[in-house]
Amino acid sequence: MIKVSLLFPNSDSMKFDMDYYCNRHIPMLQKKLGTACKRVAVEEGLLGASPGSPPAFAAMGHLYFTCLETFQAAFHAHVTEIMEDLPNYSNVQPTIQISAVKIHRRRARL
């Protein structure tokens, strides 16, 4: 399983429209990626590591694919349209991390 994470760094000047991201961008993304995208998750940063500190990332989006080749084929076919939507929800470029998921469980084993 491959996870593609988009990490939106937090700052005082950063703008992020979570409503637009969740209700317009992600559905558009899912439609374009089709069945290649197996799962999505969106997170909103609440706090940093120290009590009361701001989160390092204001928002994070995660996309899951069966393999790297599937992600590359699906994403690269629509990369221009997907990235052109960025100004509609944020004024910062996300940091992108592509990872191999090694453990993914629905509940902890005791």
What is the predicted role of each segment?
Residues 1-110:
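Macromolecular interaction modules
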